[in-house]
């Protein structure tokens, strides 16, 4: 197991509430897969709390740089709630989106046997720009 640490990456939009979470989420998910000696396909779904479309795209790009392709099993709660129609590029509230999706459709699908192996990584901004 890795020691706890702070992940901070240089980026074009450091004050965006979602993009700072993406490098930390990438590090966490990469470490989890390594620790479990697993591949993304070993899970039914891998879900982040609320990176929104912008942060989710960055997460997938960062992990592809490490030869990890989450795209077949990856979803983001903020992106699921807001979709493409609402123009919420960076999603909403990490804790709100996480709770709504985890306690709603994800746990319901687990209870019904549609999801057996789930990775849920709570993400979202913890900052006040």
Regions inferred by a protein language model and the residue ranges of each:
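Condensing-enzyme catalytic core mediating Claisen C-C bond formation in acyl metabolism
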Residues: 1-30, 35, 72, 79, ...
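Claisen-condensing/thiolase-fold acyl-transfer catalytic domains that form or cleave C-C bonds
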Residues: 18-19, 44-129
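A short alpha-helix capping/helix-coil boundary motif
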Residues: 8-9, 39, 85-86
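Phosphate/pyrophosphate-binding loops at sites that engage ATP/ADP/AMP, CoA/4′-phosphopantetheine
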Residues: 28-42, 109-110
């Amino acid at each position: 197991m890795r020691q706890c640490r702070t992940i901070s990456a240089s980026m074009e939009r450091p004050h965006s509430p979602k993009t700072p979470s993406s490098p930390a989420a990438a590090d966490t998910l990469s470490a989890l897969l390594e620790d479990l000696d697993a591949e993304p396909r070993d899970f039914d779904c891998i879900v982040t709390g609320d990176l929104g479309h912008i942060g989710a795209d960055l997460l997938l790009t960062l992990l592809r740089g490490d030869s990890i392709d989450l795209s077949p099993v990856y979803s983001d709660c903020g992106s699921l709630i807001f979709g493409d129609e609402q123009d919420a590029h960076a999603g909403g509230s990490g804790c709100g989106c996480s709770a709504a999706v985890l306690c709603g459709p994800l746990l319901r699908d687990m209870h019904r046997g549609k999801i057996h192996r789930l990775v849920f990584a709570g993400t979202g901004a913890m900052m006040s720009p």
